[in-house]
Each structure stands twice: as C-alpha cells, then as structure tokens.
C-alpha cells in the first residue's frame, strides 16, 4: 500500500530491521592540501560495489565528512529507500570540504582546493578501489550550502565527469572566495568565472538531473531567488523545490531523499 507522506518521511531516516549498508573511512596523504585527508564511502547492502553508480556528496561550512552520515542520516535514508523499492542502489563518497591547506608550519581553510582533490585524487582512488562509477553516466555530485558552491564549481568546470547534480540550500555563485570575513586565503572577489559554462548551448545535455532547492525560511532565501534569474537567463533546465524550514537538516534530509529518487534512473 502507499505510505502517507508523513509516515514515509519518518521511515526514511529511521533505523529499521532491514539490511543496512556499510561505511568505510579511507585515509590518504593529499599532494594538493599537503595534509592527511579522509573520505567516507557508503556501500549499499546486499550488492557488490563493482558497477554501482556513485554520488559524491558534500557537507556545509563548519561541518565535516561525517556530517551526512551522523546528523544527515544519508546512509539510513538510502537503506530505507532501497528496501522500499524507491531507488536502485548506489554508493556515496563524502569528503571533507573544509580543506585545511598546509603552508609551511601553518594551516588555513581553502575550500576551493576540494575540486582538484576530487578530480585528481579522491575520484581516481575511490573508483579504482571499489570499482564503482567509472564513467560520467554513473557519477553524480551534490552538496549543501558551502558544498553546493563546491558542487556547482566542480560540475561547471568538469561537465564531462558528472551526470547528476544536486544544489541543496544552494548557491550557483561562489560566496566564500574573496569574502573578507570568510576567505582565509585573502583572495580578491571572485568573478564567477565558472558560470560561463552555463552559456554552452550543450550545457543542459550534460546532466540528467539538475536539482536546486532551499527552505522557505532559509536565511539565504533571497540569494536563492536572485539566482532564479540567472538560471532562467542562461536557460538551464532544472528541477526546483522549496521545502518548509530553514538552513538546517530538517530541510536537507528530505531534500536528499527526494534527490536520491531522481538520479541514476
């Protein structure tokens, strides 16, 4: 029988007596950040990892690679959606977007480095070991807040690598680089160069899903609405949704659950 919306949402992020996937912590020395780094791999239950699609999933400012599987319950949501027959199994890779770049004896936050780390280190390493992904059609990227900025920049610079895109409570414009209060590197204001990729007539053909969402009481809602105009001006085909709630996990959990049901079809 069909579940009511409220009951279904309750079940999606509750631990139940069903098969559960695994979480593995992978450590490596990054040549880009000059630091030891970690990413977390979720593998769904009862299926081999080889050949699975994979979603690279990023957290927000001030959080870490564990956030999506602790507060976010992303692994539990996927376990439940798989058991309910709502999605086909796919893997997750969650990396630390608060990249601490080691410069001499000091460390400083440089979130921009994540793009290179993903493309040059994390994706090759994870996909070689677990044999998932391996091609654009089996690879997606999504992120919330700061992670949405990292997602947009990465998919715009590398549309050949990803077929599914999720921008949660999200921004298509960079809002950290060049910000005097948040950019520890002290760069000049960023000129949104990555958005030029959206002027490509083939931009919409690169992605199966381009999902953008936010809460109706989010402190960044006005910025999101401003970016509606950019999306429309550039003719980007998107799925857009506004949820009840603020800039918090009460929005991001159902947002992730909905996005999971759109991708890798």
Indicate where each model-derived feature is located.
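Cap/lid segment of the alpha/beta-hydrolase catalytic domain
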Residues: 61-131
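Primarily recognizes the serine-hydrolase "nucleophile elbow" in alpha/beta-hydrolase
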Residues: 128, 134-189, 193
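The feature captures the conserved acid-bearing segment of alpha/beta-hydrolase catalytic domains
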Residues: 175-239
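Short beta-strand element of the alpha/beta-hydrolase
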Residues: 40-43, 50-62
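Single conserved hydrophobic/aromatic residue that forms the stacking wall/gate
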Residues: 1-11
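N-terminal cap/lid segment of alpha/beta-hydrolase-fold proteins
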Residues: 12-48
